[in-house]
Swiss-Prot record:
Organism: Homo sapiens (Human)
GO molecular function: alpha1-adrenergic receptor activity; protein heterodimerization activity
A single Gene Ontology CC term: nucleus
SUPFAM superfamilies recorded: Family A G protein-coupled receptor-like
Positions carrying Phosphothreonine: 264
Record-linked PANTHER family: ADRENERGIC RECEPTOR-RELATED G-PROTEIN COUPLED RECEPTOR, ALPHA-1B ADRENERGIC RECEPTOR
Protein name as annotated: Alpha-1B adrenergic receptor
GO biological process, one term: adenylate cyclase-modulating G protein-coupled receptor signaling pathway
Disordered: annotated span: 394-432, 479-520
Length: 520
């Protein structure tokens, strides 16, 4: 797609892929011959080559990172991300097979690889651009289903259906791009140093509609509907949550004077019936789908901003010579469309924390499988280690867990940052007898306890407390949960849960506080 195209003849072909014809000319209506070549400006060639080379390299590396992020992280292997990978593959193919030759044509000013390769190169250009926008069209439909039917989405959009949709994208792209290779084009020019896509009017109209304008209309309609549904659903879910919260009589923190057994029974009954659970599930799933729709909306918006100027300027310049933009402006518009290929790898980590973490792991050469082996070893050794220090101010329950799920070489205690949770102060009688050193509870290999509960004995009336000071201050049991497949890091893998029931030096006080790894 060389912007130095002679558009003196009236044609409806918006030759929007590949370098356009008459690339090696010095005036608007001059064409070169086999014996005349433009003189190469070395300084300009080096500067333009470095800029375009850096751009192409960034596009290649960025799209490879997107593909590896989904391939190496099981929790990212969702139907939506399959469409993102397909988009990255189209951009990567464009960066490998089209952009280097477009840059060479821009630097040299003429085509050097012959007529046959010119036709193949132009067809691949059409193929990649069409696959990109059809992938965005499939993404917009997927996001509408995800927002409109958030609870039914896993059954409506399965992995098999997503793969079939991706195959359809490439089949349609091939049908649109293969026409010139089968003879649907105007006669080839005599000069092999001229290279461009066909300007045959019917093919130009067919390719323009099928590759850009019809998919663009579908994308805009889908995202308008996504916005309307998201706005209405958000209002309904928020109203439902507020209503359930006003009708609910459950309290997370209960202050009462009943004994520990009665309160435990009431807590168990409360867990069995939660009127807000269905609303919470709907709100969580919908918010997740809406966030994904926002990220992909940015991708679609940038695609339109990059390609729309080109698809407006080129047809108008081809049909009406007076509306043709200056060569410098047209070159900027032309490369702006190609620039879209390196934008998506920037958008994903900036809009998605999951992609950002995946990019960091890949760039840091961190093996995902090695992290899973470490977590399995941690679970075999007991999961989490707790330390109770009764004579600190207010007392504290300290939890030691590595943020990267790592164990020290000795296999005794888990390494990592210390997390503290306020607990109860010990009784004066306990301190008066001379308190023992802090109890260090470490994850030894022989621990095989199936449950977890850290609790203090039920508070006694003030008159009888002194008789029971010789009893244990608390009891401890350990729990490890199986790793949920497809989760990342330590936020929900394995993990530990504990309920701390503390006396706090006051009779009748109780606090239930669940602990989850990474949530303090």
């Amino acid at each position: 797609m060389n912007p130095d195209l002679d558009t003196g003849h009236n044609t409806s072909a918006p030759a929007h892929w590949g370098e356009l014809k008459n690339a090696n000319f010095t005036g608007p209506n001059q064409t070169s011959s086999n014996s005349t070549l433009p003189q190469l400006d070395i300084t300009r060639a080096i500067s333009v080559g470095l800029v375009l080379g850096a751009f192409i390299l960034f596009a290649i590396v960025g799209n490879i990172l997107v593909i590896l992020s989904v391939a190496c992280n099981r929790h990212l292997r969702t139907p939506t991300n399959y469409f993102i990978v397909n988009l990255a593959m189209a951009d990567l193919l464009l960066s490998f097979t089209v952009l280097p030759f477009s840059a060479a044509l821009e630097v040299l000013g003429y085509w050097v690889l012959g007529r046959i390769f010119c036709d193949i190169w132009a067809a691949v250009d059409v193929l990649c651009c069409t696959a990109s926008i059809l992938s965005l069209c499939a993404i917009s439909i997927d996001r509408y289903i995800g927002v409109r039917y958030s609870l039914q989405y896993p059954t409506l959009v399965t992995r098999r259906k997503a793969i079939l949709a991706l195959l359809s994208v490439w089949v349609l792209s091939t049908v649109i791009s293969i026409g010139p290779l089968l003879g649907w084009k105007e006669p080839a020019p005599n000069d092999d140093k001229e290279c461009g896509v066909t300007e045959e009017p019917f093919y130009a109209l067919f390719s323009s509609l099928g590759s850009f304008y019809i998919p663009l209309a579908v994308i805009l309609v889908m995202y308008c509907r996504v916005y309307i549904v998201a706005k209405r659903t958000t209002k309904n879910l928020e109203a439902g949550v507020m209503k359930e919260m006003s009708n609910s009589k459950e309290l997370t923190l209960r202050i009462h004077s009943k004994n520990f057994h009665e309160d435990t029974l009431s807590s168990t009954k409360a867990k069995g019936h939660n009127p807000r659970s269905s609303i919470a599930v709907k709100l969580f799933k919908f918010s997740r789908e809406k966030k994904a729709a926002k990220t992909l909306g940015i991708v679609v918006g940038m695609f339109i901003l990059c390609w729309l100027p080109f698809f407006i300027a080129l047809p108008l310049g081809s049909l009406f010579s007076t509306l043709k933009p200056p060569d410098a402006v047209f070159k900027v518009v032309f490369w702006l469309g190609y620039f879209n290929s390196c934008l998506n790898p920037i958008i994903y980590p900036c809009s998605s924390k999951e992609f950002k973490r995946a990019f960091v792991r890949i760039l840091g050469c961190q093996c995902r499988g090695r992290g899973r082996r470490r977590r399995r070893r941690r679970r075999r050794l007991g999961g989490c280690a707790y330390t109770y220090r009764p004579w600190t101010r207010g007392g504290s329950l300290e939890r030691s867990q590595s943020r990267k799920d790592s164990l020290d070489d000795s296999g005794s205690c888990l390494s990592g940052s210390q997390r503290t949770l306020p607990s109860a102060s010990p009784s004066p009688g306990y301190l008066g007898r001379g308190a023992p050193p802090p109890v260090e509870l470490c994850a030894f290999p022989e621990w095989k306890a199936p449950g977890a509960l850290l609790s203090l004995p039920a508070p006694e009336p003030p008159g009888r407390r002194g008789r029971h000071d010789s009893g244990p201050l608390f009891t401890f049991k350990l729990l490890t949960e199986p790793e949920s497949p497809g989760t990342d890091g330590g936020a929900s893998n394995g993990g530990c849960e504990a309920a701390a029931d503390v006396a706090n030096g006051q009779p009748g006080f109780k606090s239930n506080m669940p602990l989850a790894p990474g949530q303090f």
